[in-house]
């Protein structure tokens, strides 16, 4: 699939994809994923063609941008590494996020409180989000999926070949997808200028690490305050001592 020149993969984006290990696939390869294989390493890990990944990502972005109401797009991730990325994608593009467990019947049972009638579904992993894909097939909703080389492709209309197990890879794909959607909608008019949002915002962060970092920062601030108080006390004592000596000299 040949893309217009404006959609070509830039060296900066290629470096991001490689740095996030998006090109590292699985050891096993499904038949439908064979066209996306670039090579195989000696340890058995298959390398994904980053050019194919970019082509499918742009195709998915064009499909998303063609839907008039952004809320009709549902972004799903039951995988932990993709939940933050899905929420950020929805915040930037206006899509409807489902982060966490997908409630069965959300697309088929209109009695449930979580019932939705989307026009497009995007999932992070066809295995983890199999229930959502299955229900989408029942009601003829097209599905875009982030697929690894060993991921099943049944009922998936557009597969974006990538490493859908790494937290950096998942976050970067959602980031690039959101950026391309905004560019196609006209929100980001200048393609030569980078997006003000950094990819790190889409990466998964461990809550325990965040709490530990917050505690360390609080301890550091407390230590700095104690040091300032000690310095202030020493300065006060020195000033009092100097005043006493001055009084004695005058006497």
UniProtKB/Swiss-Prot annotation:
Gene3D superfamilies: Glucose-6-phosphate isomerase like protein, domain 1. It is found in: Cytoplasm. CDD domains: RPS2. GO terms for molecular function: structural constituent of ribosome. Pfam families: Ribosomal_S2. Residues 218-237 have a biased composition (Acidic residues). Its main location: cytoplasm. GO terms for biological process: ribosomal small subunit assembly; translation. Belongs to the universal ribosomal protein uS2 family. Component of the small ribosomal subunit. Mature ribosomes consist of a small (40S) and a large (60S) subunit. The 40S subunit contains about 33 different proteins and 1 molecule of RNA (18S). The 60S subunit contains about 49 different proteins and 3 molecules of RNA (25S, 5.8S and 5S). Interacts with RPS21. Required for the assembly and/or stability of the 40S ribosomal subunit. Required for the processing of the 20S rRNA-precursor to mature 18S rRNA in a late step of the maturation of 40S ribosomal subunits. PANTHER family: 40S RIBOSOMAL PROTEIN SA. This is Small ribosomal subunit protein uS2. It comes from Candida glabrata (strain ATCC 2001 / BCRC 20586 / JCM 3761 / NBRC 0622 / NRRL Y-65 / CBS 138) (Yeast).
